[in-house]
């Protein structure tokens, strides 16, 4: 019996563990793992194929080859389990122990572990405080290191060459000092380190020193030494005396046909080590000359190096075929390594894949599964059923039965499959909806049938896509698949909360066609009693589908809910003016939706909104049924509509010729201006591109207008316009296929094309596809089309990598509690840019939790309490009240440690309710941001390379009626013509309404001409200012006569003779292209007054000096009279490149990587008054004097645009030098909230440009993870080192502990880490190692003796536990609670026994002990 129980024990190794620790192994530890020493390099006997004794595959050390059978065959079968054969020394046990038993090699000379030597920064170097170069010279026998100086003047750990050593020996005598070479020397040095003493010394030096570099160096060394002290790891273990040998099954030797063997490279590497080791042993026994021994030791060191990490030092060892051998390090790192290949992504049983075809008759929760596939996938279930039914007695018989595919097997398959969901997955799985569960329906054929509505979520189409099927086996898995993953339970996108089951293409076309209305259709104006009458009339061809008629329609209104929570509806009959098609369609409306939602042409956006409304009003079940009905109706009606397209549907607008000839004339005009030198070539190009862009838009507009409307005669005989029934127009208008841009290419003009580098070719393609292109036009258009395809191929990889980094940084962020109780939040406003509302307030706060009461602005009463989740109805209320700012909770200010709380996150967008505890919101955020990235890269090539340019604004007009107000920063002067010229760079114009509330604000650029006054009342549509969009001016703020300085031709400026026009302009040349002597001087102009004195800045004795930037075209002459507001020079702006997501994806990556841009803006460090100090060479000195009178200096390169002027007051964090913002500066000067604003807005800009909706909270979640580390400023009484970077949660925990003891807590500064850096610096070394830089991460963790608490998802997947999210979180919590209660119980029992045994009579004691044994 006991043997049987032991058998089971072997199978179940369910050890529970809560953390994994990594460290360095001591030689004793390595020997304790080992089952014997490998002494010979042999592998297996090539005749008998049996492993050689004491060799690399020795059965005595590693275990038997066959289960329960020793090598010589003396002991076989189970009854001899555990016996060790006296003949061959092999233990009789399972063969799989060869996967876990290790051996060892006793090294004849110690060798250094290459990771601790060469992985930067060198750990050995840090501990010994020696340079890597020196240590390498010692290890590879090029130099001696002094161990014991004795009485000599030598220093400990001093390096000397061999000649030096001999000379010193002669000088001081043989035994006066000890010096060694090789790993032995280093080992002795390490042994001699007194860690405690070193730490004290370094701490003292840290206090004493003031130099930054030294502090950094000491802190690094201190960290390593303290880690050694804390973990109890001895530094000398970095030198190996015993080398462990990997179990043989993990480095297999596989016989190929033809008597050859395929072997793992590790065997070669081990063989080399053993050979060299044995040779060295022999040489030492023979007392060989020092030089030979030394050489052999060096070779041994090199062999061990290659085994551990081949190619890290020197040349990689190569095998017979000249390729480098794969070492142990390569086994674990990279995409094909242990982590990413076998631990994070495994192949699974019970799965299959096949092509998908459309299944229009399926319900949303079903998929069609080919019978043969199902038979294979559900085999074990069928076997079981066959046995229980008594048809087959054994598994073998059952197998036979299934293979013969008898009719009874098919019946059983039907039964087994019922109610058993399967999971379908389409690669690439970019977000949660890439795997969904369906109930299988058996079908003939070999292709999987997929429901059309889930295609959007899978991003699938039926042009040959394949999908994989997986079978959830256990009951729990089936339950989870059904409740959480069933397609009908996932109808919203987790990225933005929109419905994912929206019909597309022909369904949309059918619904649109049905719900269009037509003037004077057959039977217009008839009145019907009910819908069935309409259907009768339609079927008898009395009315057309689009005719306008009146129908009595029954609507169901929600009355209330009864006790069970089921809704009760009351019918309400009204006469509606509608069309035949809409009336017929109204039959499928779910109860609770009014008819008005259908009483309009259903375009794709409308249908999406309709499904969304249904979901919010009628619940999930009704919505799914409704979507299915919509689909069926759409298909049916599209078929009935019979829409097709012909070449005649592409109507070319008659105005096209005229528009094109006008544009050509304008272009010729610009060419003339260029010839006569009024404009530069760059300006001409910009203008030409603009003209053609506008012409293309005009043609497009004319074409759309013609397509859009047609003239018809109404009932009264009048001619009226109605929306056209042109097929192409209907397809584009309904959103079924095609876009205005594509139609423009068919029937308008193709327009401007882009070159592969993104610049626009200035000659447009004036033809369209209907007229056909000539050869030149075709050639130009191939450019763009090919670029689209090439881009797609290259960018998909980038996007996938971005997603990988995002997932890695957020994978451990899980909702762990319902409410953290914080009172912090962020004030949300509508996003307004250039007077347009880009994102309404309602969209930004929907699904968030309020953190302050929302107050009715009219009555000042509380409308919505704090802590309320804002749903659609409440958002409508806020809209109606006219509230323009709401303070809501955000993931950034959540106080939960090691996770998030539900209230700060708000609504789970994929489910439409408050987020559940255990939801892995980090991964969802990462997927929501990464998934569209891939989509965007693939979308480029559909337009076929036609250039899309953002039109340049050259004026700004008011959208609202109201009063103009200028901000305090707005400064302007009046020029000679009486125009107002803006001379501030950050001025804004506001429009306020009668109540003084701000309606819109507009930035007015430098050099613009203002057309309104401060305080002027204006009407909507009034122009506020105009400016030249193609150049930036430099404007004079004073009147006087110009006096040039350093404007020397050929030195600082070049005379650009335009070879075409023969005219010249002065252009400032780049300092980098000047000679060394003239680099520092900069061309500038001063102004002289009437007396010839320099004009001074009022209130100072600084002269007015206006510098010319690089590339500026100087428009004034020396000695010319200039007025205030006159233009002195123009700087041409760069020509436009086409903006698409290429600019986008790298931009998003750059934001999340928190890279400092080059030429970043300079922000004011303090609030104060600016002034200019003395210029140094090449730099200008800007001084800000703060309110206490302290001066802060900034040195700014002279070619930079300074945005402030003398005497201006600036606020902390305000931009003073133009340039892109540096996120690190924003965080430092303006705080977390501003930084989050900046990143969220910038990322959203990129996606918005592509029309992709992502909820802000996903980006905020990522920003939270980028901010999760802090830098310790003042240590207080905590265990940290100053300047150390630690997890915020860890620091707060430590502070709590210190405060509880009444000591001083540590203070810290926020740190912003890029996503890669944040992933690598996570506390979990398993997660970091599986991400990137595996070697470095593991080396560091081992030295630190790090413990991984398995908090994140990734670590748990790798060690094979349930992840602590979703149902796994509940499981882990229950397990921990159970363990705690068991511990308490054990403690209680122990205490009880303790109390019972105060004076125990001997008899009682004996019985108690006896019971203990029996129990």
From Swiss-Prot:
Report the transmembrane regions from the record.
none
| Enzymatic class | transferase
Q: Where does Zn(2+) 1 bind?
A: 70, 72, 85, 88
State a single Gene Ontology molecular function: DNA binding
Q: List ligand-binding residues for Zn(2+) 2.
A: 820, 894, 901, 904
The alphabetical list of record keywords is: DNA-directed RNA polymerase, Magnesium, Metal-binding, Nucleotidyltransferase, Transcription, Transferase, Zinc
Relay the cofactor remark from the entry.
Binds 1 Mg(2+) ion per subunit. Binds 2 Zn(2+) ions per subunit.
Q: What is its EC number?
A: 2.7.7.6
**Record's GO cellular component terms:** DNA-directed RNA polymerase complex
Residues the record lists as binding Mg(2+): 461, 463, 465
- Swiss-Prot/TrEMBL catalytic activity: RNA(n) + a ribonucleoside 5'-triphosphate = RNA(n+1) + diphosphate
Q: Which GO terms describe its biological process?
A: DNA-templated transcription
Which coenzymes or cofactors are required? Mg(2+); Zn(2+)
Under the heading SMART domains, the entry gives:
RPOLA_N
Location of region: Disordered: 1382-1415
The record's similarity note reads: Belongs to the RNA polymerase beta' chain family.
> What is this protein's function per UniProt?
DNA-dependent RNA polymerase catalyzes the transcription of DNA into RNA using the four ribonucleoside triphosphates as substrates.
**What assembly does the database describe for this protein?**
The RNAP catalytic core consists of 2 alpha, 1 beta, 1 beta' and 1 omega subunit. When a sigma factor is associated with the core the holoenzyme is formed, which can initiate transcription.
Output this protein's name. DNA-directed RNA polymerase subunit beta'
State the species of origin: Cupriavidus pinatubonensis (strain JMP 134 / LMG 1197) (Cupriavidus necator (strain JMP 134))
Q: Which gene encodes it?
A: rpoC
């Amino acid at each position: 019996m006991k043997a049987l129980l032991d058998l089971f024990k072997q199978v179940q190794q369910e050890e529970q563990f809560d953390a994994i620790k990594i460290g360095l192994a001591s030689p004793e530890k390595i020997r304790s793992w080992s089952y014997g020493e490998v002494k010979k390099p042999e592998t297996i006997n090539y005749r008998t194929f049996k492993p050689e004794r004491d060799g690399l595959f020795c059965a005595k050390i590693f275990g038997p080859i066959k289960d329960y059978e020793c090598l010589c065959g003396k002991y076989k079968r189970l009854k001899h389990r555990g016996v060790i054969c006296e003949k061959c020394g092999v233990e009789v046990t399972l063969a799989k122990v060869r996967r876990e038993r290790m051996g060892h090699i006793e090294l004849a000379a110690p060798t250094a572990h290459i990771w601790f030597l060469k992985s930067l920064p060198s750990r050995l170097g840090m501990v010994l405080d020696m340079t890597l170069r020196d240590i390498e010279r010692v290890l590879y026998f090029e130099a001696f290191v002094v161990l014991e100086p004795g009485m000599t003047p030598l220093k400990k750990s001093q390096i000397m060459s061999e000649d030096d050593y001999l000379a010193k020996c002669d000088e001081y005598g043989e035994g006066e000092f000890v010096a060694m070479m090789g790993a032995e020397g280093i080992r002795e040095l390490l042994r001699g380190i007194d860690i405690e003493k070193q730490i004290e010394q370094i701490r003292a030096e840290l206090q004493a020193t003031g130099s930054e570099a030294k502090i950094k160096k000491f802190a690094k060394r201190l960290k390593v030494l303290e880690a050694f002290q804390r973990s109890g790891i001895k530094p000398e273990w970095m030198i190996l005396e015993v080398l462990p040998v990997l179990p043989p099954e993990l480095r297999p030797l596989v016989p190929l046909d033809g008597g050859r063997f395929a072997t793992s490279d590790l065997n070669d590497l081990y063989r080399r080590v053993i050979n060299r080791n044995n040779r060295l042993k022999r040489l030492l026994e023979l007392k060989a000359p020092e030089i030979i021994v030394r050489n052999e030791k060096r070779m041994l060191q090199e062999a061990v190096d290659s085994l551990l990490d081949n190619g890290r030092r020197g040349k990689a060892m190569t095998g017979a075929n000249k390729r480098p051998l794969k070492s142990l390090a390569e086994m674990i790192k990279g995409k094909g390594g242990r982590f990413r290949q076998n631990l994070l992504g495994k192949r699974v049983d019970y799965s299959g894949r096949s092509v998908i075809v459309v299944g229009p008759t399926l319900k949303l929760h079903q998929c069609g599964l080919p019978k043969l596939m199902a038979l294979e996938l559900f085999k074990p279930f069928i076997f079981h059923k066959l046995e229980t039914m008594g048809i087959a007695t054994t598994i073998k018989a059952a197998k036979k039965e299934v293979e013969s595919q008898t009719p009874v097997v098919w019946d059983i398959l039907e039964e087994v499959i019922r109610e058993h969901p399967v999971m379908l997955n389409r690669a690439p799985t970019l977000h949660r909806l890439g795997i969904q569960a369906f109930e299988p329906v058996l079908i003939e054929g070999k292709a999987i049938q997929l429901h059309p509505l889930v295609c959007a979520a899978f991003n699938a189409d039926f042009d040959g896509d394949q999908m994989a099927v997986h079978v959830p086996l256990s009951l729990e898995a089936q339950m989870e698949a059904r409740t959480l993953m069933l397609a009908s339970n996932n109808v919203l996108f987790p990225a933005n909360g929109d419905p994912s089951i929206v019909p597309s293409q022909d369904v949309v076309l059918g619904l649109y066609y049905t719900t269009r209305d037509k003037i004077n259709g057959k039977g217009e104006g008839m009145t019907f009693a009910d819908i069935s009458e309409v259907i009768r009339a339609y079927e008898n061809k009395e009315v057309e589908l689009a005719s306008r008629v009146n129908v009595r329609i029954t609507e169901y209104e929600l009355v209330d809910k009864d006790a069970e929570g089921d809704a009760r509806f009351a019918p309400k009959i009204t006469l509606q003016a509608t069309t035949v098609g809409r009336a017929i369609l109204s039959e499928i409306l779910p109860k609770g939706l009014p008819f008005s939602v259908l009483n309009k042409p259903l375009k794709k956006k409308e249908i999406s909104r309709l499904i969304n409304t249904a979901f919010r009003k009628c619940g999930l079940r009704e919505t799914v049924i409704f979507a299915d009905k919509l689909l069926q109706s759409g298909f049916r009606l599209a078929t009935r509509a019979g829409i097709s397209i012909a070449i005649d549907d592409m109507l070319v607008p008659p105005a096209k010729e005229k528009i094109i000839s006008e544009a050509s004339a304008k272009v010729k005009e610009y060419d003339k201006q260029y010839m006569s030198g009024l404009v530069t070539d760059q300006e001409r190009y910009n203008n030409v591109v603009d003209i053609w862009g506008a012409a293309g838009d005009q043609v497009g507009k004319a074409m759309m207008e013609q397509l859009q409307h047609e003239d018809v005669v109404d009932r009264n005989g009048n001619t009226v316009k109605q929306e056209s029934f042109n097929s192409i127009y209907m397809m584009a208008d309904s959103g079924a296929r095609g876009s205005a841009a594509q139609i423009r290419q068919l029937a308008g003009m193709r327009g401007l094309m882009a070159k592969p580098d993104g610049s626009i070719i200035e000659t447009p393609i004036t033809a369209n596809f209907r007229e056909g292109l000539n050869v030149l036009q075709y050639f130009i258009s191939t450019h763009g089309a090919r670029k689209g395809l090439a881009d797609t191929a290259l960018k998909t990889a980038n996007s996938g990598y971005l997603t990988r980094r995002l997932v890695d940084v957020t994978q451990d962020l899980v909702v762990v509690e319902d409410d953290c109780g914080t009172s912090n939040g962020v004030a949300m406003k509508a996003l307004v840019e250039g007077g347009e509302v880009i994102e309404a307030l309602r969209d930004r706060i929907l699904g968030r939790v309020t953190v302050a009461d929302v107050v009715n602005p009219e009555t000042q009463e509380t409308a919505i309490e704090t802590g309320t989740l804002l749903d659609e109805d409440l958002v409508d209320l806020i809209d109606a009240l006219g509230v323009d700012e709401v303070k809501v909770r955000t993931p950034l200010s959540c106080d939960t440690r090691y996770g998030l709380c539900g209230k700060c996150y708000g609504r789970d967008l994929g489910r439409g309710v408050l987020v559940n505890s255990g939801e892995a919101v980090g991964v969802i955020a990462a997927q929501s941001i990464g998934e569209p990235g891939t989509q965007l890269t693939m979308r480029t090539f559909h337009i076929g390379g036609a250039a899309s340019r953002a039109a340049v604004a050259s004026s700004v007009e008011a959208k609202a009626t109201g009063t103009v107000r200028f901000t305090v920063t707005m400064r302007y002067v009046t020029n000679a013509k009486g125009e107002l010229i803006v001379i501030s760079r950050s001025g804004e114009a506001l429009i306020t309404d009668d109540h003084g509330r701000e309606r819109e604000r507009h930035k007015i650029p430098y050099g613009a001409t203002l057309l309104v006054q401060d305080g002027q009342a204006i009407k909507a549509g009034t122009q506020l200012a105009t400016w030249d969009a193609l150049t930036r001016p430099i404007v004079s703020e004073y009147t006087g006569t110009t006096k040039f300085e350093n404007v020397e031709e050929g030195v600082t400026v070049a005379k650009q003779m335009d070879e075409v026009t023969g005219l010249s302009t002065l252009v400032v040349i780049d300092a980098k292209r000047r000679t060394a002597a003239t680099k520092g001087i900069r061309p500038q102009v001063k102004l002289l007054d009437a007396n010839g004195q320099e004009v001074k800045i009022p209130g100072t004795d600084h002269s007015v000096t206006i510098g010319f930037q690089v590339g500026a075209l100087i428009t004034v002459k020396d000695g010319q009279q200039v007025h205030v507001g006159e233009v002195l020079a123009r700087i041409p702006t760069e020509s436009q490149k086409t903006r698409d997501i290429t600019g986008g994806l790298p931009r998003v990556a750059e934001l999340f990587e928190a890279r400092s841009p080059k030429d970043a803006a300079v922000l004011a460090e303090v609030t104060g008054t600016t002034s200019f100090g003395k210029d140094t060479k090449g730099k200008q000195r800007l001084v800000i004097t703060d309110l206490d009178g302290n001066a802060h200096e900034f040195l700014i390169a002279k070619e930079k645009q300074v945005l402030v002027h003398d005497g201006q007051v600036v606020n902390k964090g305000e931009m003073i030098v133009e340039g892109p913002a540096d996120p690190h500066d924003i965080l430092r000067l303006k705080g977390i909230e501003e930084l989050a604003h900046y990143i969220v807005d910038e990322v959203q800009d990129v996606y918005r440009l592509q029309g992709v909706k992502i909820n802000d909270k996903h980006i905020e979640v990522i920003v939270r993870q980028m901010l999760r580390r802090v830098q310790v400023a003042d240590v207080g009484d905590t265990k940290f080192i100053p300047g150390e970077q630690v997890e915020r949660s860890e620091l707060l925990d430590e502070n709590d502990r210190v405060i509880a003891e009444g000591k001083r807590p540590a203070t810290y500064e926020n740190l912003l880490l890029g996503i890669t850096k944040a992933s690598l610096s996570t506390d979990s070394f398993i997660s970091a190692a599986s991400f990137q830089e595996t070697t470095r991460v593991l080396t560091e963790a081992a030295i630190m003796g790090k413990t991984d608490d398995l908090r994140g998802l990734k670590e748990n997947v790798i060690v094979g536990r349930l992840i602590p999210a979703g149902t796994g979180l509940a499981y882990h919590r229950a397990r921990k609670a159970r363990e705690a209660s068991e511990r308490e119980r054990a403690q209680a029992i122990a205490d009880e026994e303790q109390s019972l045994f105060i004076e125990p009579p001997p008899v009682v004691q004996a019985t108690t002990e006896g019971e203990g044994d029996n129990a």
